[in-house]
Amino acid sequence: MAQVAIIAASDSGIGKECALLLAQQGFDIGITWHSDEEGAKDTAREVVSHGVRAEIVQLDLGKLPEGAQALEKLIQRLGRIDVLVNNAGAMTKAPFLDMAFDEWRKIFTVDVDGAFLCSQIAARQMVKQGQGGRIINITSVHEHTPLPDASAYTAAKHALGGLTKAMALELVRHKILVNAVAPGAIATPMNGMDDSDVKPDAEPSIPLRRFGATYEIASLVAWLCSEGANYTTGQSLIVDGGFMLANPQFNPE
């Protein structure tokens, strides 16, 4: 039986690119979507073109714990799970003094609670299978440095980074490796861009002077799913074009 990778929010952007690269590596792919079903179907068509299976399910992490049960449906349809990529997320910006509690909770529900529940479902199945597995959390550079006027998002990404380390330490006895990938400014639909926006000198405030491509995140995820990463766990790997070396976002006014 082929190995199975489930990628949350794989209807576009980083999640879609992860699905396609893992399909090229021979994984059957579980695809989830929140609001773009057609995007998920497009991903599935491209996945199947690589000669592997694809299954689609809607995943609403704003409604927990019930929403996370969609992951169990995918595991049942695909027969197992070997890789989980927690790529779903919510984000809003507001000054700390103006942040509404409801908005705060919405971000934490999706970004932290959702990742916790999906990881728990996946890890329990991996333990049952007895063959180990990989869990990869897509965080952000703001797991490591604050995003101005985004206290909830910053705190949630820090929390997900901490969860990554805690899971890695506990699950290693089951040969389940857990890591985070922390993207910088990537050309994704969530950011109002696509890979055509990855141009030289398009963003001079980043040392590499451009936005990142979704492939540049997905290729690291794919490596973390490979035998080459058999000795890597509990890490947060930053892919940011040098942003963290020269964070330009703080404006002292």
Regions found by a protein language model. Name each.
Residues 140:
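Residue(s) in the substrate-gating loop at a strand-loop-helix junction
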